[in-house]
Amino acid sequence: MTGITEDGIEIDREFAASPEAVFAAWTTPESFSRWFGGREVTVPLDGLDYRAEAGRPWSAMMVLPDGNTIDWAGEFLEVDPPSRLVMTLTDRPAVAERAVLTVELTPTAAGTRLVMTQQTPGFTDEQRLGTIAGWQTFLDVLSEIAEG
């Protein structure tokens, strides 16, 4: 199911790539910088601190088409290749509250099923739908990377 949940969002999606390839696209800095933000946004490697190790903080700077930037921050909570990644994230690093994002990857006959959940405290349903749409554009690019 892709949609709104009681406390956030869920995206359920298939990839024509192995769980190892999808997991690598999530956890390799060079791949993450290519897909995080979709096609219209860049994430320069020199603005990215992203090593997927449990307990390690991460940060990224997105450069929008108009030149403005968004700073992202979080922490890796669980890193279990190639099946599970749990991390926190926020686009307001000065605020202590972080959303928890969980990615679960399951092998299928066609490749991999991704089930991603994100807590969205304080979001309206309209904001949650916008978050789903945004993640889908990110995952379109991740799919191209993972599927090679």
Regions found by a protein language model. Give the residues of each.
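Hydrophobic ligand-binding cavity/cleft-lining segments
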Residues: 1-42
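Alpha-helical scaffold segments that form or flank carboxylate-/histidine-based iron centers
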Residues: 17-18, 101, 130
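Hydrophobic-ligand binding "helix-grip"
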Residues: 33-34, 48-53, 57-109, 119-121
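Short, well-ordered beta-strand elements
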Residues: 114-118
